[in-house]
Amino acid sequence: MATLEAKVVIVTGSASGIGLATTKAALKEGARVLAVDISPRPSCLEDDPELDFFQCDLTSPSAAADITQRCLMVFGGINVLVNVAGIIDHCSSVDTLTDDIWERCMAVNLNAPVKLMREVLPIMKKQKSGSIVNISSKAGSSGAVSGVAYTASKHALQGVTKNVAWRFKADNIRCNAICPGGVTSAISSNIDSSAIDFAAVETMLPIIDSVKVNRPDFELVRAEDVANAIIFLASDKSSRISGAMLPIDDGWSTI
């Protein structure tokens, strides 16, 4: 039996990277998936009766409610929420940070997952089961990975994950976070290179390079590697795991 057989899964950020890999993996494991992204449906997501693609801006005030209602309308329930969608900053230190990038990072990386959890939790409580997987980052436990806005948003998301895990364990609802580090994805494609804080980047490069150089293939972590862990935490095979911060970073978390 497939690990997500008959489960209804919401995946945000599903048009590329980790979200796309997770959407494909969930379908392969028997799930019915509501795939959400601000971008249009990618051509590689073929027509599938178990898939519904919903184009949506997560920063819209009604986004969380709209996504939840769409999932209930199409699939009749919600078993799993996977909060993948995220943006990065320009590696800005606090002295070069703009209000816009701070507010944008918080809106997408923290506010959107929190609001979606708020919407789905009553449904999960009523059915006495559910699994939530949030995508944090190596930056959620370190100050030497990205800029201050991204770092703060991912630290905060880990705190939210732990709080939800503890508060709703009596309802048989689990909440965990994946903490990727050095993943090949499109998250950096929208960065304005002219706004990058290169002085900050210079302090981080030696650490990042050391992570890559001791891999036999010199490759970054693949989106599929992260998706495999997400599927495990979404499934009943991890029924006693809640409140975990799981690093997928080739050992980066050890330094």
From Swiss-Prot:
Molecular function (GO) terms listed?
A: oxidoreductase activity
Which GO BP terms apply? secondary metabolite biosynthetic process
What superkingdom does the record give? Answer: Eukaryota
Is the keyword Transcription regulation assigned to this protein? no
- Indicate whether Thylakoid appears among the record's keywords: no
Q: Which Pfam families match?
A: adh_short (PF00106)
What is this protein for, i.e. what is its function? Short-chain dehydrogenase/reductase; part of the cluster that mediates the biosynthesis of shearones, diterpenoid pyrones (DPs) which are structurally diverse meroterpenoids consisting of a diterpene linked by a pyrone, and which may exhibit a range of bioactivities.
Q: What is this protein called?
A: Short-chain dehydrogenase/reductase esdpF
Gene name of the record: esdpF
